[in-house]
Amino acid sequence: MPTLTPGRVRHGVVFTLKHPEGSPEEADFLKANSELASIPGVEAFEIMREVSPKNPYRFSLVMEFVDRAAYDAYSAHPDHVSFVRDLVVPAVTDFLELDSEAL
């Protein structure tokens, strides 16, 4: 991702799933995450596998928004709310969310 310009927001989540590594359930969950990119306001989207042994997480998801208002609208969007409720809560064992604004 390019350098964040002032005012833009980068939303990141690192997480670990309940599903066994390499399982069909893991693959389905990761594929479903791409649906978040279609929610209005999402301007950049990446989902990645964590490679550092320095943290306990297995995956990361990063997206960018033009500003806080766009991020807030995304967070409250019904598709995001239902995604978290129906897919994230049952499947994720641990996570850390980082929401950052460029200086």
What are these model-predicted stretches?
Residues M1-F59, V66-A76, D99-L103:
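Short S/T/G/P-rich N-terminal loop/turn motif that feeds into the first structured element of a domain
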Residues R68-L96:
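C-terminal structural segments of small proteins and small subunits
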